[in-house]
Amino acid sequence: MYKELTKYKSTNHFSFTPEDQLETQCNATEGSGVFLVYECKGEEKQLIMVGSTGTVQNDGTLKSKNGGLFDKIVNGHQFAKTGRKYSWPSQMKLEKIEALEVHWFETFGGKLKVIPTYVEGQILQNYLNEFGSLPKWNVAF
């Protein structure tokens, strides 16, 4: 796990296969934060995507889309102009990915107010430093 994520207490993870329904497997909250997607092959896990949700406004308040992390993971668009609940299973079959493990972290709430895209950027920068590229499902940042 990335050290930037150890301070967040509202966190969990879930597994997902192409046969599962993402909306029933996803246990993320409606809070704002980041999520990391790992490709699982046996005991090995490889980070393949980092995402976030929630925008901090000029006055320091958070603008969050309805549904927060849960909605971003399940209904956010990726690979097509359609929600991940449809595109992830298709992409997993195409790439012969057996399972995904999704870890999510609320970064903005209560006393802790860390901008979700800042945390996303930190993790992506660390990945870039280590591997020389972004995770394969991150198109750009």
Q: Which role does the model predict for each range below?
A:
Residues 1-48, 52-141:
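Boundary/linker segments flanking structured domains
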